[in-house]
Design a protein with these regions (language model features):
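Polyanion-binding surfaces on beta-sheet-dominated domains and ring/shell assemblies
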Residues: 1-136
Length: 136
């Protein structure tokens, strides 16, 4: 109804307003939202959210972790869900960033959560990029 549509609109406006240029990085010519910027969206808005791990595959022998999670966001009577999958393997680590099972799993889970946030708030992210970073 109209009240729900107004709530969605106001939430998106607030999300755009919490972002800044430092929340993005240009990778191969494309602006990508950083993890901290995406987490700001979740923590700065008047919404409730639940992050649940649905599947976890870890191969200790080859150093591979795959996480599938579901992000549920609630605002008023509106509830939205998005899946996110994150993968990390041992070959991504080096002398600077040491390989541990914790680091590998944490990186895979962060990637899964990031993808779910991008799915739910993609229009906000795209709007910010087009209006604030488009010519940079």
């Amino acid at each position: 109804d109209k009240k729900d549509l107004d709530l969605i609109k106001q939430t998106k406006i607030k999300a755009v307003n919490v972002l800044n240029e430092n929340d993005f990085v240009k990778i191969n010519g494309t602006w990508e939202a950083k993890r901290d910027g995406l987490m700001k969206i979740l923590s700065s808005l008047p919404i409730n959210y639940i992050w649940e791990i649905k599947e976890r595959m870890i191969d200790h022998n080859i150093g591979y972790s795959e996480i599938v999670g579901v992000l549920t966001v609630k605002s008023g009577n509106i509830e939205r869900r998005a899946d996110g999958m994150g993968i990390c393997s041992k070959i991504e680590f080096n002398e600077k960033v040491k390989f541990t099972l914790h680091n590998m799993n944490a990186r895979a889970e962060t990637r899964a959560l990031k993808r779910a946030i991008e799915t739910l708030f993609g229009s906000v992210i795209n709007y910010f990029v087009m209006h604030n970073l488009g010519n940079k």
